[in-house]
């Protein structure tokens, strides 16, 4: 191929200075000193580096020239004129043959190279365009600088040309015709499959706890059917409260078995040494010191009394009274017979209308007698017969 020959032609001038340098460093065949040998090697190294950079610049120049020729040919095929800044450059670079070995090697892809993807090709062409524009501005500073805008304009022309070649006839046919009204909507498609189940939602706020206040009672329901009789329960204890409520309105007092001298032991002659046998506390009240019996409820009362007396000092009779509020209500008098014993009893009773807070008592009339307070012979009591008759 032509490429290796060019490489040999370029590398031959580099070999001659290397031989001349080696002869100069030898100093007519004499052995060189260590310092001069190092300087010669350093010089040869820089010279080789400069030559390699020149070769690289030349290769880039040739590649840029071939690329510009291809773009110029594409513009001529599209029928567009070149930019003013690139006309002189393209004419000056037109002397190189695009079919030369170096141009074909640098500008065209090798047959073994695999085609790139569309995105990769666009990136590669953009990087090549930027590199080529920089080289053109470097080698031709007198002409109008190339910019990326011109390269984009060229690429847009290429794309528009290719699109016009593919869709041009169809678009030309449609020119001049008005678009018709849109057609009716098509039938709806079949429903798609159900989507996946979504995540569970956030739990709600717990409710306020209710109150335990009891509501108003409802209306009474209808009575149910009568149930069977139950078993007989055990006998209960007597109800003291019921017994007390049903207790009869009576009081009975009796003596405590003592012997009393009226003159020495009684104050005012009223008997007070009583022992309660029965008494309804809701109707009667006993005053132990004074010996008086107080009535708590208005009504009609039956009052009775008996006293056993012992005669002394030749007294031939005995007498006592039943007083109500210190006023005589009943009186009993008994005389002694000649040749009889000195003991004797006297009994009296009567019915009286009494008001609440009135007091009953037994009062001795004569002071020269003694009283035998035996529980069987001396007693005093009252019975409430009922309400007082209306007057």
Curated annotation (Swiss-Prot):
S-S bonds: 332-346
Subcellular location, record wording: Cell membrane
GO biological process, alphabetically ordered: animal organ development; canonical Wnt signaling pathway; cell differentiation; cell-matrix adhesion; cytokine-mediated signaling pathway; gene expression; hair follicle placode formation; immune response
Regions of this protein lying in the Extracellular compartment: 63-391
One cellular component (GO) term of this entry: extracellular space
GO molecular function: cytokine activity; death receptor agonist activity; death receptor binding; receptor ligand activity; signaling receptor binding; tumor necrosis factor receptor binding
Outcome (variant: residue 374 to R): In XHED; decreased interaction with EDAR for isoform 1; decreased interaction with EDA2R for isoform 3; changed downstream signaling
Highest taxon listed in the record's lineage: Eukaryota
Record keywords: Cell membrane, Cleavage on pair of basic residues, Collagen, Cytokine, Developmental protein, Differentiation, Disease variant, Disulfide bond, Ectodermal dysplasia, Glycoprotein, Membrane, Secreted, Signal-anchor, Transmembrane, Transmembrane helix
Record-annotated membrane-spanning stretches: 42-62
Biased composition (Low complexity): 86-101
Post-translational note: N-glycosylated.
Result, substituting residue 252 to L: In XHED; loss of interaction with EDAR for isoform 1; decreased interaction with EDA2R for isoform 3; changed downstream signaling
Effect of residue 158 to N: In XHED; abolishes proteolytic processing
Consequence recorded when altering residue 332 to F: In XHED; likely pathogenic
Polar residues compositional bias, start-end: 102-113
Disease: Ectodermal dysplasia 1, hypohidrotic, X-linked: A form of ectodermal dysplasia, a heterogeneous group of disorders due to abnormal development of two or more ectodermal structures. Characterized by sparse hair (atrichosis or hypotrichosis), abnormal or missing teeth and the inability to sweat due to the absence of sweat glands. It is the most common form of over 150 clinically distinct ectodermal dysplasias.
The protein, known as: Ectodysplasin-A
Organism, scientific name: Homo sapiens
């Amino acid at each position: 191929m032509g490429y290796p020959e060019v490489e040999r032609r370029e590398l031959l001038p580099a070999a001659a200075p290397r031989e001349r340098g080696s002869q100069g460093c030898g100093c007519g065949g004499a052995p060189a000193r260590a310092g001069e040998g190092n300087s010669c090697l350093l010089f040869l190294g820089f010279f080789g580096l400069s030559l390699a950079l020149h070769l690289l610049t030349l290769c880039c120049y040739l590649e840029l020239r071939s690329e510009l020729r291809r773009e110029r040919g594409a513009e001529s095929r599209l029928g567009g004129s070149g930019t003013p800044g690139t006309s002189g450059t393209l004419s000056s670079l037109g002397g190189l043959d695009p079919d030369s070995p170096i141009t074909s090697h640098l500008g065209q892809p090798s047959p073994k190279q695999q085609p790139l993807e569309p995105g990769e090709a666009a990136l590669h062409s953009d990087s090549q365009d930027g590199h080529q524009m920089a080289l053109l501005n470097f080698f031709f500073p007198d002409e109008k600088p190339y910019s990326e805008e011109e390269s984009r304009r060229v690429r847009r022309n290429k794309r528009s040309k290719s699109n016009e070649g593919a869709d041009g006839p169809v678009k030309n046919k449609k020119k001049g015709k008005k678009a018709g009204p849109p057609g009716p909507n098509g039938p709806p498609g079949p429903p798609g499959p159900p989507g996946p189940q979504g995540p569970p939602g956030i739990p709600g706020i717990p409710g306020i706890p209710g109150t335990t206040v009891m509501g108003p009672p409802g209306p009474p329901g209808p009575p149910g059917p009568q149930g069977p009789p139950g078993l007989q329960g055990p006998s209960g204890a007597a109800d003291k409260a019921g017994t007390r409520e049903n207790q009869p309105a009576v009081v009975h007092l009796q003596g405590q078995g003592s012997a009393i001298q009226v003159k020495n032991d009684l104050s005012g002659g009223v008997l007070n040494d009583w022992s309660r046998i029965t008494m309804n506390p809701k109707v009667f009240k006993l005053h132990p010191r004074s010996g008086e019996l107080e009535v708590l409820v208005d009504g009609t009362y039956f009052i009775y009394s008996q006293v056993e007396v012992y005669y002394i000092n030749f007294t031939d009779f005995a007498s006592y009274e039943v007083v109500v509020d210190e006023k005589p209500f009943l009186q009993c008098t008994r005389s002694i017979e000649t040749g009889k014993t000195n003991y004797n009893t006297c009994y009296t009773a009567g019915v009286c209308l009494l008001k609440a807070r009135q007091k009953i008592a037994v009062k001795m009339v004569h002071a020269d007698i003694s009283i035998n307070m035996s529980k069987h012979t001396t007693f005093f009591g009252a019975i409430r017969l009922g309400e007082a008759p209306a007057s």
